Amino acid sequence: MLDSKKIYLPNKPNQKINVKKIFAIDSDLTVLGFKDKTQWVPETDPTYVFDKNTTLAILAGFQHDRRVMIQGYHGTGKSTHIEQVAARLNWPCVRINLDSHISRIDLLGKDAIVLRNEKQVTEFKEGILPWSVQNPVALVFDEYDVGRPDVMFVIQRILEVDGKLTLLDQNQVISPHSSFRLFATTNTVGMGDVTGLYHGTQQINQGQMDRWHILTTLNYLDRAHELSVVIGKVPELKNAKGKALAKSMIQLADLTRQGFINEDISSLMSPRTVLTWAQNYMIFKDIKHSFRLTFLNKCDEAERPIVAEYFQRCFGEDLTESHNPDS
């Protein structure tokens, strides 16, 4: 159980990290990480491609104890970005998905019946929040804009730097560990969903939003960056033919994004969708079939002819969906 274990690391990070070398980013920023790796550190993905602005915001959060929120469309790698930075700093990282079933009890803890000397006794089991606050942990709240209001006000207690966590049931006040860090990812900027893409998101109290020191936006990547991601994850496409195919995939994704902005279609392809399509292509060896399975079948039936037209523009081939049966 997490709540029964302490992470034994120095109170402060003890190893200098060369940002330019480790993250391939032209920056003079100096950051510190931990020399030793523990079981809570995410696995390093050597093919990961870092976005400069997002990475610098995350690094500032780690180095200067800033509360960092990353906002952006789905599939852009917001949470993965934090994990991969943490992995290279050897910084323990825990992610919590703030779905509607997460409660105050889940975060703070509860009384539980346990066996002690063959007798049942009631004992308080602390939740993930007190455990994280007391350890050198980067705590990441995913889907932050889906959290319930009562849960959000629990989080508000620790948003301020050196903000102490009070457990009323235990008459206990917990001071944060000097290397505790807090991050969040969100699809909206706390004003609710205006796109229709993110059902279930809620408006966030502006007093709470004000407590986040840094808000950076990670939306869709430029084509060269996105191509690097796809080629890195699907090395079979590193040849000339494969790169040309990947470029056409990304071109099609851009058309769906532009179509969404213009309100021509209600679905769009994220970088994750493009990557999934490339991986499915390697399985089925059929660009049309893998496209249908990855994205087209998820589109509104009335919009499929438009998406099929995008496909024809990029690949010079027709899909059967190109012709609207109602026309």
Task: Describe each model-derived feature in a short phrase.
Residues 1-243:
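AAA+ P-loop NTPase catalytic core and its hallmark functional loops
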Residues 1-38, 48, 55, 222-227, ...:
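Alpha-helical lid/collar subdomain of P-loop NTPases
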